[in-house]
Each structure stands twice: as structure tokens, then as C-alpha cells.
């Protein structure tokens, strides 16, 4: 990789002490006013569709690829289903609505700190990055902008390596736009510049690096499992399948897929 972005969520730590699906669900349903898991984004008539983000995270969190097993029949995944159902009601609300999590994309040094005004939302006095609700340390998602590899049978390995080396040089990394450089010394220099201009604080830089340190990457190709989850979410959100039925169906289909591919 030569660059990356991070999709995450910011939350006021005073409003939520834990970021597991069960904790988020409890906070939403016990609120005196309608409280949705996420701030609804303006993205067409249907609002922002959180199903793909939920499917991507769950394909990572509820699969043990070493054992070729999964836990979609767990209370945690069922809480994920309930959160997504709650969020569906937010689509009918005017923008913005009352939500716990604020979606954020970190694409360069200038967006390392969360700024609610970028999304036309009221500011938070304080925030932490928590990612999508997860039983693990962080539910944020790492997106590589480009991935390069050298073919083992290539007869031009030296030239290919020279090109890859150039992509990691300071001048090339400094010129990247809408992505964070993988060359950490370049990123440090960019953040130091932001700090000098007082557009960011050291605390906000520390929060960013805590986020980076907590990122998890899926250890298998998750697309087939994500597809299964999305297919079973459709009847659930349409009211044609119960929470237990959906969880059992996803568990059965994903387990069969894992046994066929990885056992």
C-alpha cells in the first residue's frame, strides 16, 4: 500500500461508556427521546444505508477463519440486527437527527481531527473514535487506496521494485491527495505543520494514533460472507423474517461456506 483512508465514527464519551452492540442498543432504547445509533446522513431519499458497513464489520468480527467457524447466532450479532432496524427509522427524519455516533472519514492530515461542521452537524465538546459498534477494540475500517505487488515470475523485478520504492519516497508521499501517506515520517511532518498552524491539537493527534493502533484488518477475503449477510438483511428489514430467523440463516449459510472453503 502507498496510501490509506479510515472510515470511523466519533462519539461523545460522556454519552456512552462502552461501544459493544449490546451497550449501544441499551443506550438507544432506554433514551427518553428517539435516539438512533447513527447521525442520519443526507444521501438521497432513503438516507444513508448502513447495511454495507454493518455487513463488512460483522464479516470480520463474527468469523474465526482458523477454526472455519462463526458466531452469527450470538446475542451480539442479534444486537447488531436490532441496531440496524432502529437506524431504518432515522431515514424518515429530517437531517440531522438525534444519534449517538457521528460518521467520519479520515482522508489526509487535514481531516485527522473530527470536525462536526464538515458534516453540517453541531460540534461535540469532546470525542473519541470508536468505529462501528463492535465487541473488539475498534470497529473502524482501514481502506488502502492502492495495493501493488511484484509477480514472482516477472523478468523486470528490479524495475518494478524501483517503481515501488519511488512511490514510498518522501516527495511522492508528500504529493498524495485524499489519502494518508504510509510513510509515517511524512505524516508526522504534516501533522507537525497542522499543529504549528493551530488547526489541530496534540490531544487530537494522540486520538488519531490511538485509532490507528487499534485498527484490525480482516484475515480472509470477506466479500462472500458480506454478500450472505446483506442478502439475509433484506427480508429482515422488510419485516419478512424475525431477528432469530435471520441470525440462524446467516449462521447456517456462512458456516457452510467456511466449511467448504477453509476446512
Residue ranges and their predicted role:
Residues 47-48, 52-55, 60, 65-97:
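Glycine-centered hinge/linker elements that transmit conformational signals in sensory
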Residues 33, 164-188:
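Periplasmic-binding protein-like
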Residues 79-156:
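Extracytoplasmic/periplasmic substrate-binding proteins
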Residues 18-24, 235-250:
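Short, charged, surface-exposed loops that flank catalytic or proteolytic processing sites
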Residues 1-26, 36-67, 142-150, 224-234:
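Periplasmic solute-binding protein
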Residues 177-235:
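Long, aromatic- and glycine/proline-rich binding clefts that accommodate carbohydrate-like moieties
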Residues 244-245, 253-263:
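Conserved N-terminal structural module of periplasmic/extracytoplasmic solute-binding proteins
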Residues 79-80, 155-167, 246:
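Short amphipathic alpha-helical coupling segments at ligand-binding clamshell hinges
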Amino acid at each position: 500500500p502507498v496510501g490509506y483512508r479510515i472510515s470511523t465514527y466519533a462519539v461523545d464519551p460522556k454519552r456512552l461508556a462502552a461501544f459493544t452492540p449490546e451497550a449501544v442498543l441499551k443506550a438507544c432504547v432506554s433514551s427518553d427521546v428517539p435516539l438512533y445509533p447513527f447521525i442520519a446522513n443526507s444521501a438521497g431519499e432513503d438516507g444513508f444505508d448502513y447495511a454495507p458497513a454493518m455487513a463488512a464489520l460483522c464479516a470480520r468480527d463474527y468469523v474465526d477463519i482458523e477454526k472455519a467457524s462463526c458466531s452469527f447466532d450470538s446475542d451480539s450479532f442479534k444486537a447488531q440486527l436490532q441496531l440496524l432496524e432502529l437506524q431504518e427509522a432515522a431515514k424518515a427524519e429530517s437531517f440531522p437527527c438525534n444519534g449517538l455516533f457521528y460518521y467520519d472519514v479520515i482522508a489526509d492530515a487535514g481531516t485527522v481531527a473530527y470536525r462536526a461542521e464538515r458534516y453540517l452537524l453541531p460540534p461535540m465538546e469532546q470525542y473519541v473514535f470508536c468505529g462501528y459498534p463492535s465487541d473488539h477494540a475498534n470497529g473502524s475500517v482501514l481502506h488502502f487506496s492502492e495495493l501493488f505487488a511484484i509477480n514472482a515470475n516477472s523478468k523486470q523485478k528490479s524495475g518494478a521494485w524501483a517503481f515501488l520504492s519511488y512511490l514510498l519516497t518522501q516527495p511522492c508521499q508528500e504529493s498524495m491527495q485524499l489519502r494518508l501517506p504510509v510513510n509515517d515520517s511524512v505524516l508526522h511532518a504534516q501533522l507537525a505543520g497542522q499543529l504549528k498552524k493551530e488547526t489541530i491539537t496534540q490531544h487530537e493527534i494522540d486520538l488519531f494514533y490511538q485509532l490507528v493502533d487499534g485498527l484490525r484488518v480482516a484475515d480472509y477475503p470477506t466479500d462472500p460472507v458480506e454478500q450472505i449477510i446483506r442478502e439475509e438483511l433484506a427480508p429482515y428489514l422488510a419485516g419478512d423474517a424475525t431477528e432469530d430467523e435471520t441470525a440462524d440463516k446467516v449462521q447456517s449459510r456462512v458456516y457452510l461456506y467456511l466449511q467448504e472453503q477453509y476446512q
